[in-house]
């Protein structure tokens, strides 16, 4: 019963679309911004960092709660595979929010949150390093902003690096990370599929 409760609550936590709520309060329709994604990146572009940054942090932290409580409080004795499925359910909730007719965000910030809890920030450091290198190279080419297609490519490169890290952890006593990784990859790939298709056509 506890396992089902944890997975369900984590899904509902991920499904709360803070960026959409903040945008509505500001009178902004995120569906008309850039790629129409109802996430923090588009809110940032539409309303600036004062609104985008808090939304980004909320998207991040909903990937950590409530699983962090169960991970750090060993008295609950929750199976680590259940924790992995719960972390994945939070990402799924953001990507396919029932509060937005199952049309959610790209789930990158929520992914960072989930991996922070299960890997003590190691997973997000892998993704963050790849994203930073990509941004530096992009600026060296004289570009200040990335397109949705370039963002999608960056995410896929980041997940390729995360796969290497995941396999290393799997073979060193954390096989449950394979569940989180492959489920997470499928969700993120699906959410970026159209941008990736356009990117590959333009290469």
UniProtKB/Swiss-Prot annotation:
Assigned keywords, A-Z: Cell inner membrane, Cell membrane, Lipid biosynthesis, Lipid metabolism, Membrane, Phospholipid biosynthesis, Phospholipid metabolism, Transferase, Transmembrane, Transmembrane helix
An example molecular function term from Gene Ontology annotations: acyl-phosphate glycerol-3-phosphate acyltransferase activity
GO cellular component: plasma membrane
Catalytic activity: an acyl phosphate + sn-glycerol 3-phosphate = a 1-acyl-sn-glycero-3-phosphate + phosphate
Known EC number: 2.3.1.275
Pathway: Lipid metabolism; phospholipid metabolism
Listed name of the protein: Glycerol-3-phosphate acyltransferase 1
UniProt organism field: Thermotoga maritima (strain ATCC 43589 / DSM 3109 / JCM 10099 / NBRC 100826 / MSB8)
